[in-house]
């Protein structure tokens, strides 16, 4: 099952509302899911999104939107989402593939 929360514009003001908690997040270029990542309690969803917003990752520099989901097991949930994407599209999201 994909991330259940809606997509938000990837702006500093919107990211400031993201949680300081563990979970998973997705980055989008328009309607295309380009990256799925996880956040631990030490590197929260908000912190991870701010990192991407600062354009520190070349592949996600064009990301326009994000979504997130809290999870007690972010690594497991990340794998579930990626496996669902692969089952549907036959490949990883482009920025996950670049990171592999």
Predicted segment positions?
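Short cysteine clusters
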Residues: 37, 57-59, 95
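Short linear functional motifs in flexible/disordered or boundary regions
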Residues: 48-49, 61, 93
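Secondary-structure transition/hinge residues
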Residues: 57, 86-89
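GIY-YIG nuclease catalytic motif and its immediate N-terminal context
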Residues: 1-44, 69-83, 100
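Basic nucleic-acid-binding interfaces
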Residues: 57-71
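A broadly used, surface-exposed interaction patch
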Residues: 45-56
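Coupling/hinge elements of helicase-like and P-loop NTPase modules
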Residues: 88-100
